[in-house]
Amino acid sequence: LASKSSTRLAALTVAAVCSAASTIVLTSPAHADSVRVHDIQGSTRLSPYAGEQVTDVAGIVTGVRGYGSSRGFWIQDPQPDADPATSEGVFVFTGSTPKGVAVGDAVTVSGTVSEYVPGGTSSGNQSLTEITRPVFTVVSSGNEVPAATAVSARTVPRAYAPEGDEAANGSVNGLTLRPAKYALDHYESLEGMNVRVADARVVGASDPYTELWVTVKPWENANRRGGTVYGSYDSQNTGRLQIQSLGKPADFPDANVGDTLAGTTAGPLDYNQYGGYTLVASEIGALESGGLERESTRRQSSRELAVATYNVENLDPSDETFAAHADAIVHNLASPDIVSLEEIQDNDGATNDGTVAADATVGKLIDAIVAAGGPRYDWRGIDPVDGEDGGQPGGNIRQVFLFNPERVSFTDRGTGDATTATGVTKVRGKAALTHSPGRVDPANPAWEDSRKPLAGEFVFRGRTVLVIANHFSSKGGDQSLSAQYQPPARGSETQRHLQAKAVNTFVKDVLSTQKNADVVALGDINDFEFSRTTRLLEDDGALWSAVKSLPRSERYSYVYQGNSQVLDQILVSPSIRWGGRLSYDSVHVNAEFHDQISDHDPQVLRFRP
């Protein structure tokens, strides 16, 4: 991804900004003036009272949120009905910091029932039932808060979500909740209620927005480092739950994957655009370390070529992470011979003044690598056209090759630039690039507002290796796993499919020139190893994703919403797959840690050309 943080509006916005949101208004018959919370919630995702005024809705205050854009309080009816599909809690949206109300107050609330869609209706998100424009009366104070309902491996179903209603474009909104059958229905049946998890293992590290992810099913698609692997579109991992806090940000734990929130973590169950169902904790369990350590890969032998890909997340000269990135490259990656860097920004970072050169950015990293005890890398890259390659505005992110000249040489040929396509020619009977470095098919519409592939020709021990550095378009705009549309739409795939076809076509051109050419296509593919994007890259056996040489439980380079998943890949031509004695390592140094310097883990491939 170009930047995870760039998709966030501000810290602790929770259910999000009203101007970016929408409400769903339904037409329904008149109801009696006095209703209970479970009547408002109903047995589907949409309230039968949406758009109506309700009067004197009774409940006990279970939580008060006085920060962010979604301020208000939760109430819960202490006298539940017998229907497991109807929640007994609801959020009362005040818009400003609630005054005159505290946890334990018995209140009556009058206002308008609303279905608020975090992120707006175009996001495809589910809605959150709220009472808006409230007038409330405190009847008494100091009451016992309704006991928190346990969310556990026993209560959360194995199946993730029902199939959406075809007549409603795949929406689940109108379907009667089946909380004993589907995980999303189970969570919806608890929306707004006081819930708890016990001894929950962390599967998504604490982030700058004081959020983390836990699982109530620690065995579910588990990996050896404590995470939960997303290994197919049907492996959504139902035990995942986001945790936020009603306390001070300074009191939020700095948790890594594999840690445990020992004891009870409890609070109201919310829904927001940055993770769906979220336990907004008034009580957080004690942090117990799982002892997670950063990995280091082995050094390549003298006869092995080590090639790596590393997304350094919007690196520009003003960043304070150069020494840490250098240390990772030297000590955790064992100084690979060739490194494809993604998200190298221009010399003035996000300042949008027409600068496109990145020599200062790359030079600072090379100097830091030397200071860390590594080799003095040489480098190659092509400056993009200003503002044409996506990413953070003004940053002009691009891919860059680092290479160790004591181990490999770079073949410079032609005068490649941002708009000139490199091609395939034959030199001394072998496949070669017409421009090295050069860009692959840069005029192809597949690369609109996205990074164009960078191709380079290297020589190791007399053998030519062609390397293509990629950074495919991001997943921005895809519907979330917890969306109202099931299965969710992945609209961003369309562009990546075109990009994959373009790279695959180029590799086929190489192989038609030299059948046994050594080709490596690597980078931030922004898609899974089981995705159609990857299958298109691999079409007709031109390439093979080497991450699939790892056990399924070890295939991940990124952690998103508690799912450990593959985004970064190294793909190889048949000569390397079958004859290169390849060794692959996803080196976990970032994605699982709260103090990460990038949101991606680097990948290393060793082989014998």
Language-model segment annotations:
Residues 33-338, 419-423, 429-452, 496, ...:
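Extended non-catalytic accessory segments flanking core domains
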Residues 1-32:
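Secretory targeting and sorting signals
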Residues 27, 38-41, 345, 559-561:
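Generic, ordered loop/turn and secondary-structure boundary motif
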Residues 278-609:
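Divalent cation-coordinating acidic motifs and surrounding scaffolds
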